[in-house]
């Protein structure tokens, strides 16, 4: 409700990468012997309860997304088959978007690829496209059972790869993070745009503050002289 009251238009429950909900899902980290551990149904209970509680708090018109591991990529961890079953339960819980990811901070399984400035100008081979989007194979498998839009963040670098995946309806949303910062000058351009918008306001406020302090100092000096 805090996010909604602050003007956000949705919220995501992070259940990947070894964070708390991900720890509950993984038998490698969840060693509980009560209703919250053991079977997959028990390990998924915490996440589903959080979703239900969130939905009750924010209502049906506020989007709830979940970020879920396709797998932990660790022996004895959360598996792809388990992940697909959790996707079914997430659909029953009525989430609005599923972001597919994988791994955790012990085994991220997310290795970047060298930046190719001409990537958008070259035909993208199927093998390259699959390698770019780390979890596209999983998205293809889970697509038939997913009742919510699918999002992939991780690996996309070429515009054509993104368009191909979207046009093939393998996913609905492409998430970007590092690619937005990779092109030379991206950070600088973003900073310049931000500064151009911010500096006039900051300059005016700073001048007003300086003028106010100057007037205050002048008044004190005048009183001391008197």
Summary of predicted features, one role per range:
Residues 1-195, 199-202, 226:
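Flavin-dependent oxidoreductase catalytic cores
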Residues 208-225:
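Intrinsically disordered, low-complexity, charge-rich segments with an acidic bias
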